[in-house]
Amino acid sequence: FNLDNVRPGHFLMRYYQLFPAKKDSLALDLLMSQLENQPRTDEGVWWHKAIYARQVWLDGIFMGLPFYTLAAPTLAPGYETDYYDDAVDQITKTDQRTYDAATRLWKHAWDETHQMFWANPTTGLSQHTWARALGWFTMAMVEILDALPESYEPRQQVIDLFQRAMTSVVEYQDATSGVWFDVLDVDDPRNYLEATASSMFAYCLLKGHRMGYLDDKFLEAGIKAYKGIIKEFVKQNANGTISLTKCCEVSGLGPENKPHLDGSFEYYMSENVRDNDPKGI
């Protein structure tokens, strides 16, 4: 029960819509079956993975819900509205559980038990806002909106949340470079401008404006971000190719046998930074 494993289903579903084939149908059914049986919190939000029991991560919303929403009319014909309702419910409950009013940002994850070593014992929240996790959360909204019919009334809830999230994202855009730091809620010289999250935010700003979800001020921020990505991260190599630099390779929270993955700022800064990470390119 690993939501990361479901993410390729979104691409496969789009391919299947163009070129239907039995072997792909079997794979799609298998992925949908996983989601239909994925363990959930008491409030009905999927666990990120079985090894992260009763935990909701922003990452997981992107890994599972876009496929779930897109595939519903094909894999559950006649019941797609139930899937849409579930998707909107999960994303709004994730908002409610991970949003931090003090920073106007969303924390990386929430532990339902409030007992994980990385979790605040009062709120269950992890310590910080990891930029890529928030990038995944905002990209999930864009992709879910692609799949929800315009006639589906609760779709507006996702638009409202997306507008609120991108307002906060723009507030944290670095004024000089136009891109974003790896940990958004920490002002520290060790923090660094990070390419994968910056690419995600640029995508959300530009597509959000193109689709009519965001007004012109967000277009300006998106163009600034795009230019910043080229200037700050894109490097021309000696052989004539280009690289996307300053990509965080990975960041996580636990499990128990990895106590150094504690969600501290120091932990996020300890993870490897490399060129051309697939999550950026």
Where are these regions (language model features)?
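Long, well-ordered core segments of solenoidal/helical folds
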Residues: 1, 26-45, 84-118, 159-177, ...
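CBM-like carbohydrate-recognition segments
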Residues: 1-3, 22-26, 31, 44, ...
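Solvent-exposed loop and edge beta-strand segments that line ligand/cofactor-binding
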Residues: 1-7, 48-61, 119-139, 150, ...
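Extracytoplasmic mature domains of secreted/periplasmic and thylakoid-lumen proteins
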Residues: 2-68
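Well-ordered alpha-helical scaffold segments within catalytic/enzyme domains
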Residues: 7-21, 65-79, 136-154, 199-214, ...
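His/Met- and acidic-residue-enriched segments that coordinate or traffic transition-metal cofactors
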Residues: 61, 65, 83, 88, ...
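Residue-level recognition of membrane-helix boundary sites in multi-pass small-molecule transporters
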Residues: 80-83, 218
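Non-catalytic alpha-helical scaffold/packing segments enriched in small hydrophobic residues
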Residues: 136, 140-143, 157-171, 179, ...
